[in-house]
Amino acid sequence: MRGALNVYQYLGPLILGPLAAWAWVAHYGSWVPALPALLVPVIHAYVVPAVGTNVLGMWEFDTQVKLGKFRPHHGFVFGSATALIAWPLIGAPLPAPNPAAALASALRVGLVLLAVNWAYDAVALKSGILKVYTPAAARGAGPWRAAADYVVPFFGLFGVIYAGGLRLAEPWLAGAGASGAALVTLGLAAACILISSASYVAGSYLVYGHAGLKPGLRES
């Protein structure tokens, strides 16, 4: 399994990235409104894990190519797959604001991303390509439980914000131009990062009584 994950981390983005770009451009009819759908997962997957690995020491990648504890291509590994997974779930572009449709899309994408990424991280933890030092991991939990400390905010809630934000922005994005798409991309990425991170801290306080921002037991 480790060998397959090692191959996927390089081959996956090379295949899934162009497929995701083609799918979203076809979905919206041009590159400009497709940019937030393609770039927000990449930005999220660079900022959150980079801080979690090299600043807080909560995660670590055991790969040949690393910057500190972080693999420099991780944003594209997560981002390309996430954009492609979300594409068939998002629904037809909205010509006018429709909060109910946005919520339905948000829940669909959030639940699927939670399930897929929880399974992926559990396999990655079991194979050793990913290491986590969450409170559950420090207590000797297995891969699924160790990943449970962070998967809901950083995958599930991220998917809700990402998809819901895209749907709410669609009517405006249709005529906003490149500057508008850039604004939506940055604003939505910031919302995903800040809200999911705050949710992780809040959940850790509820379960463990602390922020969950200090690494637990490490291998000697």
Language-model features, listed with the residues they occupy:
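Aromatic-rich, lipid-facing transmembrane alpha helices and their immediate juxtamembrane interface loops
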Residues: 1-220
